[in-house]
Amino acid sequence: MLRTHYSNEITEELNGKRVKVAGWVQEVKDLGGIKFVWIRDREGIVQITAPKKKVSEEIFKLIPKLNSEDVVVVEGIVNFTPKAKLGFEIIPEKFEILNRTQTPLPLDPTGKVKAELDTRLDNRFIDLRNPKVMAIFKIRSNVFRAIREFFYNEGFIEIHTPKIIATATEGGTELFPIKYFENDAFLAQSPQLYKQIMMATGLDKVFETAPIFRAEEHNTTRHLNEAWSIDAEIAFIENEEEVMDVLENLVVYAINYVREHNERELKILEFELEEPKQPFPRVTYDKALEILSDLGKEIPWGEDIDTEGEKLLGKYMSENEGVELYFIYKYPSEAKPFYIMKYDEKPEICRAFDLEYRGIEISSGGQREHRYEVLLEQIKEKGLNPESFEFYLKAFKYGMPPHGGFGLGAERLIMRMLNIGNIREVILFPRDRKRLIP
């Protein structure tokens, strides 16, 4: 390898030892008889100090010719000294330019010169050199790591379902059509039907992390047309509240994992991530509408709570209950998909729930209808053709246990966790209504 150490691996035990560091030139300072170079790598900054009397003439002449963002590798001796900004410096013995950068740069990777979001996204490879941007994606990586760890610890089995499908998951029109040889097909908007089929196999508890595709024309700070979904399905449940328990514990596990393993990144972002308060409050749909009505926001019974309503409710729960995460459940059946189980004693209400985080829905789930005849009728009630769902319905004919699950939006979870205002900030190459490149 071209480097022996990242910047954060240089400790006092290495004082007087030879190391090799590599990265991008962040800053050069020429004070005549002494020259400085600050090199940035994935983990931080390294100071290279080149006194004329201690380095070769070749290195001394090379340093002033460096440009910001040149890629370099430096071999030298570590010197811990209070005179260095970072507490240590490297006196270079070898200094190699691996690649020159063109100038001017399309944006400033330090973030000192502000750039529009579109400019940043068009040049994402430079944007990520900004420590604050990189911190987001290090946290994202650990969120996915924590999620997998949680599921495996809880006895879940990881599955991978098709992303090219023949029919709509929920009967909607918000699908991206594609040509599949002589057939018409679509990009999957959810693994919903497939993870439910898995409940008839005996696997009992499954999860998947994968992209989903939704042809919604929303162009907002909270919508993407390609996003990552964290899906789970659990067999042999008694009711939807058991699924809510799993989702709550998953989200808490992920947040606390970031708190423990991303202290440096949170410090870079100047953000204090608080431990979630448990248990998450569980607010019925009717109660949510009552709260909103008291706040001057009227929503007709049976309709979804809109963006404004979510924000108002989020503010109310924060100010009055001191919580950022809470469930809304017991929704009107007409507001939820065909596969959600209704209450037998009150069929206008169903066993669905949403998880809200700081006024944004980050997850939906519920107990599913596992009884074949009832499910068939619910498909018809939604105006859908059962023949389009034959592959799915077949699994319900031969022994389908009671089950439930959820889908959790990874980007929404991360943007709310870090209190970031635009969902495009937390995915590398966003796909939205107007962005297809890069």
Swiss-Prot record:
Cofactor: Mg(2+)
Cell compartment(s), UniProt: Cytoplasm
Chain positions of site Important for tRNA discrimination: K85
Residues annotated for Mg(2+) 3 binding in this entry: E361
GO CC annotation: aminoacyl-tRNA synthetase multienzyme complex; cytosol
UniProt keyword Ribosomal protein, yes or no: no
Residues involved in L-aspartate binding: E170, R214, S364, R368
Positions annotated to bind Mg(2+) 2: E361, S364
Reactions mediated catalytically: tRNA(Asp) + L-aspartate + ATP = L-aspartyl-tRNA(Asp) + AMP + diphosphate
Cofactor stoichiometry and binding remark: Binds 3 Mg(2+) cations per subunit. The strongest magnesium site (Mg1) is bound to the beta- and gamma-phosphates of ATP and four water molecules complete its coordination sphere.
Leading EC class: ligase
UniProt cross-references to Pfam families, sorted A to Z: tRNA-synt_2 (PF00152), tRNA_anti-codon (PF01336)
UniProt cross-references to Gene3D superfamilies, sorted A to Z: Bira Bifunctional Protein, Domain 2, Nucleic acid-binding proteins
Entries under InterPro entries matching the protein: Aa-tRNA-synt_II, aa-tRNA-synth_II, aa-tRNA-synth_II/BPL/LPL, Asp-tRNA_synthase_2, Asp/Asn-tRNA-synth_IIb, NA-bd_OB-fold, NA-bd_OB_tRNA
Family designation: Belongs to the class-II aminoacyl-tRNA synthetase family. Type 2 subfamily.
PANTHER family per the UniProt record, alphabetical: ASPARTATE--TRNA LIGASE, CYTOPLASMIC, ASPARTYL-TRNA SYNTHETASE
Complex formation: Homodimer.
Function: Catalyzes the attachment of L-aspartate to tRNA(Asp) in a two-step reaction: L-aspartate is first activated by ATP to form Asp-AMP and then transferred to the acceptor end of tRNA(Asp).
Protein's name according to its UniProt entry: Aspartate--tRNA(Asp) ligase
Originating species: Pyrococcus furiosus (strain ATCC 43587 / DSM 3638 / JCM 8422 / Vc1)
Lineage summary: Archaea, Methanobacteriati, Methanobacteriota, Thermococci, Thermococcales
